[in-house]
Amino acid sequence: MSITKDQILEAFAAMSVMEVVELIEAMEEKFGVSAAAAVVAGGAADAGAAAEEQTEFTVMLTAHGDNKVAVIKAIRGATGLGLKEAKAMSEAAPVAVKEGVSKEEAEALKKELVEAGATVEIK
């Protein structure tokens, strides 16, 4: 007996957000792929043209480190989240702390989180 697409969708609908994140990570590992959106090159672009400089960045918390309280405070300050939400975000690493920010803002947030003891990436 095979599972139908509808049954898979129903199983997804019954999962919590954390369970879906864990499932996606397991699928990425098993199939050797990334869930990040693929960038499609424009057909009219010249092959020798330089890549357009990125203007929006995402600050990713990859680990909260040993000083979890300081990291939670930094997340709260940067995002305006409540204590419970900031704690959940720090525990869900890797997670996007802020998306669509300027390079300067991303660098400043990264510095703040690293000083608090977190491991951070800018994408």
UniProtKB/Swiss-Prot annotation:
Membrane-spanning intervals of the chain: none
Entry keyword Cytoplasm: no
GO cellular component, one term: cytosolic large ribosomal subunit
A molecular function (GO) term: mRNA binding
Signal peptide: none
GO biological process: translation
Keyword Ribonucleoprotein carried by entry: yes
Keywords in alphabetical order: Ribonucleoprotein, Ribosomal protein
Pfam families listed in its UniProt record: Ribosomal_L12, Ribosomal_L12_N
Subunit-structure text: Homodimer. Part of the ribosomal stalk of the 50S ribosomal subunit. Forms a multimeric L10(L12)X complex, where L10 forms an elongated spine to which 2 to 4 L12 dimers bind in a sequential fashion. Binds GTP-bound translation factors.
NCBIfam families in the cross-refs: L12
Function: Forms part of the ribosomal stalk which helps the ribosome interact with GTP-bound translation factors. Is thus essential for accurate translation.
Family to which the UniProt record says this protein belongs: Belongs to the bacterial ribosomal protein bL12 family.
UniProt-listed HAMAP family: Ribosomal_bL12
Name of protein: Large ribosomal subunit protein bL12
The organism of origin for this protein: Shewanella sp. (strain ANA-3)
